[in-house]
Amino acid sequence: YLSARRRELYVPGADYPFRNENKRITGKIHMLQYLSDAPKGVVVISHGFTESAAKYDEVAYYFLKEGYHVYIPEHCGHGRSYRLTADPFLVHIDTWRRYVRDFLKACRYIKKAHPDLPMDLFAHSMGGAIGGIAAVWEPDWFHKVILSSPMIRPLTGNVPWPAATGIALEKCILGKDEEYVAGKKPYDGGGSFETSSATSKPRYERYKNLRAEHKELQTWSPSYGWLWASAEMSWYLRLYGWKKYTAPMLLIQAQTEDLVSVRALKNFAGKINRQGKTT
């Protein structure tokens, strides 16, 4: 069913006006397209940290059965999209704006392909931060917005958030932004369902096996550049972004959150409900 409706696409990433010519890196965004037989709308999925479009086959299936075309662009440094580092296991970004601009470039392509259909956003974890900011920058593009465990603020383990962001900033200033965050390591094929944040063992095992077979899916750990970018996205959303939403929004919190701050998510939702322009 899925393979009959699936198509691989590549769209150019967004141009970003860096002052430093060495940072004017652009590439192609890889995207999976699933076309419904009787579409009533389009859903764009913004995936999470270290994930890929391949992880969302089941989600795409459910949206297809409900009558939606589905598009899943892969963020820079993930899957088959372009990367800023030669290390295949490292998730690295030079500026959070690159994520958002690339995502909106993909959305612009999708809107042109289906001008008469409403476009909805389903965004998870890191993709929730990226998609959440995209909906701030282009509020008229998205008919409805679903943020699933959005990374309003990432959790940083035993290191307090202020200390973690301070260390990340220092590393970036010293030109060490492509270093692995302390305690993180390259992909080694390890990991287990019991120590993961997954709740379905068959789903966990499926993607673990898929990742082992495909090098492009083996992104595993963050760089200090990524950590600093996540901090900047967090501040943007919490201090400014929440004021700008106009589309109806559904925020989803997991029963147990291991990777994102529940407190930050609840505060974000509270601000929107009390003073925002949407529900």
Describe the role of every protein-language-model region:
Residues 48-51:
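Active-site glycine-rich loops that stabilize anionic/oxyanionic intermediates
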Residues 1-35:
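N-terminal cap/lid segment of alpha/beta-hydrolase-fold proteins
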Residues 126, 130-218:
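Alpha/beta-hydrolase-fold enzymes
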Residues 270-279:
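Catalytic histidine neighborhood in serine/cysteine hydrolases
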Residues 91-111:
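Alpha/beta-hydrolase active-site loop
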Residues 53, 60-86:
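Conserved alpha/beta-hydrolase
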Residues 245, 251-253, 257:
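Short beta-strand/loop motif that positions the catalytic acidic residue
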Residues 247, 261-271:
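Short alpha-helix in the alpha/beta-hydrolase fold that links the catalytic acid
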